[in-house]
Amino acid sequence: MWESHKNDYVNIAKDYCPVLLSGVIRVIVREIQRADHGGAFMFIPSSVQRNDLFRDKRWYSENRLELSQAIHRTLALNSIYRLALKGTWMYPKGVLPTAPDDFPYWVERIVYPQLTNSCIYLTKQCQRIAHLANADGAVVLNTSFGLEAFSAKLNSDIPTLPADLASFLGSKGNRHNSMANAISALPGSIGVVVSQDGSAVCFHRLSEGDIEFIDLTL
């Protein structure tokens, strides 16, 4: 059954993944806004050297994977549920326990509640990231959404920034400037800063070397 519908499963996951990940970012930002303190979090590719990026931080002894695992489980259950609505029963080993005797019952009473519970748990993990971001310093995640550190104080060495970004940062505080400087030095990285007034900005270092910044409207 898995081999017959694997491509359908994968395609559903690919289509839903950008929606889910943007939702994760949205929830984290909104939770930071709700605290009225401001905060920052960043995503750094695991392959990127970051030893000189921080002057202080609280590293975990190993990456915390709760958020990453919650994302993967939600992606899996969404694919299973979408296929089930079309009358296809399948699941990767370990996601759901048993084959269904009553297919409609299985869809309504087992798959859908598990998907709902997975989304609730994912929201709680987003809230946890937001809570850590409310501390001074940034939360550091890798691009697989593994949590590496929090309360990270970014080095404030000032690189040569594009004129439009430099002009934008002229009216911003240390949190924005430090994040922009850090992201500009790390190819493929993303940083999000939420101000105390609730406004949010995303900085992104493109693979070509350019850095873009976007006001987030949620």
Label every PLM stretch briefly.
Residues 1-218:
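Divalent-cation
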